[in-house]
């Protein structure tokens, strides 16, 4: 998809790190971290952390960020996660801080080649394909 998502840290609003606008690699060693299984499988962070990667204190992994957010809310640690998955606005006790330098990932959608879709799913996919085609056309240089 023609968009990216941003990695960062989910934490309690009363955490000392919450006062910072961004989180740097040197901020994380020694902190109890919750990492997504996606993070571990793809090893998204080893390059970002550099030599400090081995010093990370990953106390558990999660499949669903919602479950990790409950642990973060209870003060068990800090979740390495993508932005805008868990509500952090309003009266939420949680906040998200992006990593610095920025770590972005592309978003993808996949389906089986000969999949039978419901009418709603079929219309959604058609609309998505039109939007992506329009984005690509707008993003490509004008042909002379």
Where in this protein do the model-derived segments appear?
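Secondary-structure junction motif
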Residues: 17-18, 25, 31-54, 117-126, ...
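A local structural motif
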Residues: 50-59, 93-94
